[in-house]
UniProtKB/Swiss-Prot annotation:
MF (Gene Ontology): hexosyltransferase activity
UniProt keywords, alphabetically: Glycosyltransferase, Transferase
Lineage: Eukaryota, Fungi, Dikarya, Ascomycota, Pezizomycotina
Protein family according to the UniProt entry: Belongs to the UDP-glycosyltransferase family.
SUPFAM superfamilies per UniProt: UDP-Glycosyltransferase/glycogen phosphorylase
Designated gene of the protein: avaP
Function: UDP-glucosyltransferase; part of the cluster that mediates the biosynthesis of a highly modified cyclo-arginine-tryptophan dipeptide (cRW). The first step of the pathway is perfornmed by the arginine-containing cyclodipeptide synthase (RCPDS) avaA that acts as the scaffold-generating enzyme and is responsible for formation of the cyclo-Arg-Trp (cRW) diketopiperazine. AvaB then acts as a multifunctional flavoenzyme that is responsible for generating the cyclo-Arg-formylkynurenine DKP, which can be deformylated by avaC.
Protein name: UDP-glucosyltransferase avaP
Originating organism: Aspergillus versicolor
């Protein structure tokens, strides 16, 4: 991009983030690495996480208004469609598109302050993930917008880019191995949601109210919202590997795969009191470790955690159930089950034989990078695509539903524990991920964009 390297003391990296746990943790990991390498870093997020951000040595700036408030948290324990359709539409309108004006203003305020305090000699590189749309108004012609030297989109979902003949999770096209029937109906519904005039019209109205020129909003001029999130940047760095995605012969050069982040989450000051007893057991006491977790949003334990506990209560395994800030479980636990509110996955998965999860891109990428086979549930947002791709790679059994039956989980876990070929396949995938260094690649792009003419 440029032949003259800009020195680190001339570069200021701004990272935009929601304060949802999984997204903020990735911003902190990237920010901490940049700070360690000598860059100045400002992280924008909700006011409630100021202390977390400042604990890594980053400067903090608040996301304002809707961008800094409590994230939309649908009640995922509602019935299946049509409610599920309403949930996805609500999430797109209220969580992805609705906060764009406040995200834009928050970032522009920081850019203006840096220009006033540090001058034109400071090269600002901005990055965020697909949740944040702060740069979209800049690309579509917002009046008076300050444009940073470079814009990086960190890919924390499957690729949102539309492509000729290639399915994306936003277009509702399943992988070739996906069964028909209700799953096909689900994907058809998802396609209708993500390509609907309702969603696109809402996106256009938000931009129109921000003063985007009318010519830029004419039919055919404005790409679909999710596609915009993948293309309105100088570099889209997917936290995955090419083998996870369908090949795209027409993919723009801006799309690059950088592998999974090496860690997400900070090591807790003290692990559960039972940690050594379970993790470092020897001899007959050593059991295969099955971890079950539902993440921070879809955390109704009757969907997955409780059915898994029931399924494995008589099996010769050690079960670790993590709630990840979810509701308390008020049941008597079998003797082979241990409960924890939260243990960082980068620690826990290194000792795990099978992960039972409702999936999601970040969790699946970490498990793949560590060679851990999975039993996956979950169908909303990107989860069905993500989970079906993991299954297509040979690393998972995808149950393809939101609420599971104990007998189905039991069969899947036992199949994985007895399947040596699947274990070998997971180790092969782990070796693929080991070829990448996500943090170093992100640094390379920061340097390249800051140094471009």
């Amino acid at each position: 991009m440029g032949s003259i390297q800009t020195s680190k003391d001339q570069i200021h990296v701004i990272i935009g983030s929601t304060h949802r746990f999984s997204h903020l943790e990735k911003a902190k990991v990237i920010g901490a690495h940049l700070i360690k390498r000598g860059y100045r870093v400002t992280i924008l997020a909700g006011p409630s996480v100021r202390d977390e951000v400042e604990s890594i040595g980053a400067l903090f700036a608040p996301m304002q208004g809707r961008a800094g408030g409590s994230p939309i948290k649908p009640a995922y324990n509602q019935p299946p469609p049509p409610w599920a359709e309403e949930m996805e539409v609500s999430a797109l309108k209220n969580f992805f598109i609705g906060p764009i004006p406040d995200e834009y203003k928050s970032v522009q305020d920081v850019l203006k302050t840096l220009r006033e305090t540090e001058g034109e000699e400071t090269k600002v590189v901005y990055m965020d993930d697909i949740i944040c749309g702060a740069m979209l108004p800049v690309y579509f012609g917002a009046p008076g917008a300050i444009r940073p030297k470079g814009v990086i989109k960190i890919g924390t979902t499957p690729l949102p880019h539309e492509s000729a003949g290639t399915p994306t999770w936003t277009l509702g096209i399943p992988s070739p191995s996906t069964d028909s029937g209700s799953v096909g109906d689900l994907w058809g519904t998802k396609k209708e949601i993500y390509t609907s005039d309702d969603i696109q019209g809402h996106f256009e109205n938000v931009l129109r109210e921000m003063g985007i020129p009318a010519d830029n909003l004419k039919p055919g001029s404005l790409p679909r919202f999710m596609h915009s999130q993948g293309t309105c940047c100088d570099a889209y760095l997917s936290l995955s590997i090419p083998e996870f995605e369908f090949p795209r012969s027409d993919a723009p050069e801006s799309i690059q795969f950088v592998g999974a982040l090496p860690t997400v989450g900070s090591v807790p000051s003290n692990l559960p009191e039972w940690w050594d007893e379970v993790i470092h057991a020897q001899g007959p006491a050593k059991k295969p470790i099955v971890v079950v977790s539902q993440g921070a949003v879809n955390n109704d334990p009757t969907d997955l955690i409780l059915p898994t506990i029931e399924a494995l209560k008589d099996e010769d395994v050690a079960v670790i159930a993590t709630l990840v800030r979810g509701p308390k479980i008020e049941v008597d636990l079998p003797s082979n089950v241990k409960l924890a509110e939260f243990i960082p996955f980068d620690i826990l998965l290194r000792h795990t034989d099978v992960l039972v999860s409702n999936g999601g891109f970040g969790t699946v990428q970490m498990a793949l990078s560590l060679g851990v086979p999975m039993v996956l549930a979950g169908v909303y947002l990107d989860k069905y695509y993500t989970n079906s791709r993991a299954a297509s790679m040979g690393a998972a059994i995808n149950l393809g539903c939101e609420r599971v039956e104990p007998s189905v989980v039991k069969t899947a876990v036992c199949d994985i524990l007895s399947d040596q070929k699947r274990k070998e396949r997971c180790l092969q995938i782990k070796e693929k991920y080991a070829e990448y260094n996500a943090l170093d690649k992100i640094v390379d792009y920061v340097d390249a964009l800051a140094s471009k003419p």
